[in-house]
Each structure stands twice: as structure tokens, then as C-alpha cells.
């Protein structure tokens, strides 16, 4: 971990946004939002990492996640999640791009204020995380097994800084 004083709060934010209990959005749905925004930002590392985590959280295979990334409107997900992904896509373009009609539609599809809030926060946070990762030219393995192992570990352990550092250290030794 390059700077624990910055990595620790960033990991803590990811823990709250993506892993901790949520009143209504499952961890898999939140990971899909993170993966979707990362894909829109063309952040390979974050897209692949959070896609693998979503796969494990949803007890699915990667094909569902890939469908969401390619075309959320055609993916076999709830209308509410599709509406939340539309909001996330608008945030990715810029916060002021979120339209009142998108919020109204999400509410019509059953989204609560906390789900809308957290979708905006996840999308905004991942715009920052993606730029941070890409801006530092973060090491990015081109090995699906790496991402799959990391995904399974994040599901078990969350985003604690110590477990993230251990994962990357172990994977570097075996790659």
C-alpha cells in the first residue's frame, strides 16, 4: 500500500458503499453499479475487479455482468436496477446531468431515496476511484483467474485495507 493514510479512508468508503449491509440494495447490485460506471470510464482494472466481485455476490456467472455492461436495458435485471444504472450513467457524465425525470422514473420503479442517494454516491466515487487507478497507471494483470480470486476474497473479507494489500502481494508472488 503506497500511502496508508489515503488508502485506509478510500477502502473504508468502498466498504460502506459496496460491502456493508444496506437497507435494500444487495451487495451484488451495488457492485454492478461500480462495475458499470468503471466500464463507462474505460477503467479496465476497476471494471474487471468489480465485475468479478458482482459475479460472486450475485452467485452468477460473468455473462450476466457482461450483459449489464454491454446493454443494461436488455439485461435480465429488475426495472428498478435499470433505472438506477441510468442515473449512474448520468452521474458519470457529470453530476448536473442527472435529470428530474430519471429520479422520478427510478421512484416509479420502486427505488427509495436512499437507493437513489447511494447510486449517485457510488457512481461519483467510482469516477474518482477510476481516475485514481488509471492516473497512477496501476498494475493490471490480464488474467481472469486473478480477478476471480480477488472477487471471491472481497466477498468474504470486504474492503479492509489489510486484506487488499495481502491479496495483491500474494497475487504478485504467484503471477
Q: Where are the regions a protein language model picked out?
A:
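Hydrophobic alpha-helical segments
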Residues: 1-175
Amino acid at each position: 500500500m503506497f500511502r496508508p493514510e489515503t488508502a485506509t479512508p478510500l477502502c473504508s468508503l468502498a466498504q460502506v458503499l459496496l460491502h456493508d449491509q444496506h437497507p435494500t440494495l444487495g451487495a451484488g447490485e451495488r457492485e454492478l453499479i461500480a462495475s458499470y460506471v468503471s466500464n463507462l470510464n474505460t477503467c479496465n482494472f476497476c471494471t474487471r475487479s468489480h465485475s468479478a466481485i458482482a459475479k460472486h455476490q450475485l452467485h452468477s456467472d460473468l455473462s450476466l455482468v457482461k450483459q449489464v455492461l454491454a446493454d443494461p436495458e436488455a439485461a435480465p435485471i429488475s426495472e428498478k436496477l435499470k433505472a438506477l444504472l441510468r442515473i449512474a450513467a448520468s452521474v458519470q457524465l457529470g453530476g448536473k446531468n442527472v435529470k428530474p425525470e430519471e429520479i422520478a422514473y427510478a421512484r416509479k420503479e420502486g427505488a427509495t431515496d436512499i437507493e437513489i442517494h447511494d447510486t449517485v454516491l457510488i457512481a461519483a466515487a467510482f469516477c474518482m476511484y477510476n481516475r485514481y487507478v488509471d492516473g497512477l497507471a496501476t498494475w493490471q494483470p490480464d488474467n481472469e483467474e486473478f480477478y476471480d480470486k480477488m472477487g471471491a476474497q472481497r466477498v468474504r473479507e470486504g474492503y479492509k485495507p489489510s486484506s487488499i494489500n495481502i491479496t495483491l502481494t500474494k497475487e504478485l508472488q504467484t503471477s
